[in-house]
Amino acid sequence: MKKAISTNNAPAAIGPYSQAIKTGNMFFLSGMLPIDPATGEFAPGMAAEQTEQIFKNIKALLAEAGLTLDNVVKTTVFLSDMADFAAMNEVYAKHFSQPYPARSAFAVKTLPKNALVEIEIIASEA
């Protein structure tokens, strides 16, 4: 059975979807934008700062489900410009330790609200 996971410590969904879903021992987080939930505004700065805010939001949703970044098994990173990959990757690397989650990264034409970075995750309790 699936259960919606939500918290006020991460930005609310901006469409007909859940912030996250937990089913069995699996946790699926919708694509997370760099929105500060306290202000509803993007984190100031460029790709590195946006990535840092995204991780704050991800950690808040994981905590709501009783999980941490150690439970993350897969990430998908979307960039509006692949030139921002190095800046995103530097911040990303600070948040994970080995064994790192599997990851895919894509450059896309545009992201919601013209974000520079969006990250979605899959985590497991096991």
Q: Where does each model-flagged region fall?
A:
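Short, polar/acidic, helix-capping and beta-turn segments at strand->helix junctions
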Residues: 2-126
